[in-house]
């Protein structure tokens, strides 16, 4: 391809991008869902949270399922003022106690509702929330109500597999991560700094 043809093609791309950017004038918080069976949902959420913190935004995090064990994202973000509230039971397949898991979910969800109502928070991450709805630990209607009542500038990120259709219908952006290949399938164990 000649330099002239390349320049013409890139100019067409630029014109299309510029037109789309010019059309996007609304400023408000959005709701993002990272879902699917692939690796990287929580990683994507925390990458976005780190970006927000880097721009001086206030961020709150509620982690369902993963428990209180140390992780890199918390080690990085907590010293920068990010509040973490973590479901104390950890992985539900380890506890195998529906009553205790439901109670732990509801306890940490109270912090989630507080964060979603807080006008000082620019972003709230609800990590693994989808499971709480799917397992009936958390009423869907309560989640939707809290999302709808949040301050208009606040962005929310929800992660987890199998996001409920009613939540997907409500949100602004959905990214579905699809597994192509994963080291764990080849017997490589989860690694600090990569997987947690």
Task: Name each model feature, range by range.
Residues 30-117:
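Conserved P-loop
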Residues 1-30:
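Extreme N-terminal, non-catalytic leader segments
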Residues 14-17, 105-110, 156-159:
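Short gly/ser/thr-rich secondary-structure transition/capping motifs
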Residues 64, 128-129:
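Generic detector of well-ordered alpha-helical packing
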């Amino acid at each position: 391809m000649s330099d002239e043809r390349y320049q013409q093609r890139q100019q067409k791309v630029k014109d299309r991008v510029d037109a789309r950017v010019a059309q996007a004038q609304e400023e408000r918080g959005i709701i993002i869902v990272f879902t699917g069976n692939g690796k990287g949902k929580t990683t994507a959420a925390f990458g976005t949270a780190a970006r927000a913190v880097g721009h001086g935004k206030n961020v709150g995090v509620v982690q369902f399922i993963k428990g209180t064990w140390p992780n890199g994202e918390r080690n990085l973000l907590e010293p920068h003022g990010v509040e973490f509230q973590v479901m104390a039971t950890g992985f539900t397949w380890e506890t195998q106690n529906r009553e205790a898991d439901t109670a732990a979910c509801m306890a940490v969800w109270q912090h989630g509702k507080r964060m979603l109502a807080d006008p000082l928070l620019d972003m709230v991450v609800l990590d693994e929330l989808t499971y709480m709805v799917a397992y009936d630990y958390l009423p869907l209607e309560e989640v939707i109500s809290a999302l709808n009542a949040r301050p208009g500038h606040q962005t929310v990120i929800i992660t987890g597999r199998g996001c409920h259709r009613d939540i997907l219908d409500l949100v602004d952006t959905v990214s579905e991560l699809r597994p192509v290949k994963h080291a764990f399938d080849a017997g490589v164990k989860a690694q600090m700094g990569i997987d947690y």
